[in-house]
């Protein structure tokens, strides 16, 4: 539950005591952040899309980390000196960035899927990737998909969410071809699926020599 605006003075004093005792500000004040995310993403409303670019208060923990605290009053929140409507109860909130693991869970990507790149690149790939369980549900209706081995050509493969979905369905993949140009996506795919055959830029299919050349390279 958010902190009641009427009790701010009392609560702020209590927060100082907690910060001194524990070295951090407990996350109980953030309704979206009480526990680590373990499930897929719920439907989000536009009113819930708030960034953490400006804070009405800043708490500094024992290790020097600064934690922004936002105040919601009358259904409005102030960001960079401007007020915006928001559907939260009045009070103070700690709004934090999701971890990479939490983003994976929202996209129903297994926790075991590894990113051998920076968190920044991981966030980009997850944002550009599929919600795996949705794709798996759609492909589950493909006739005969799990009855015999299959060869896969994945265009604009990204981080190979299609491969993850096929794995969830128990599909026997004999060979997985991928077209992709982003070096971080390719690096991540090859880290998790080293048997993937990378075919480069998808636009090479316009080249008359592309098919025999690529076929010869992967045989």
Predicted regions and their residues:
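Core alpha/beta nucleotide-donor-binding catalytic domains of modification enzymes
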Residues: 148-219
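Class I SAM-dependent DNA methyltransferase catalytic core
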Residues: 1-153, 168-169, 181-184, 215-216
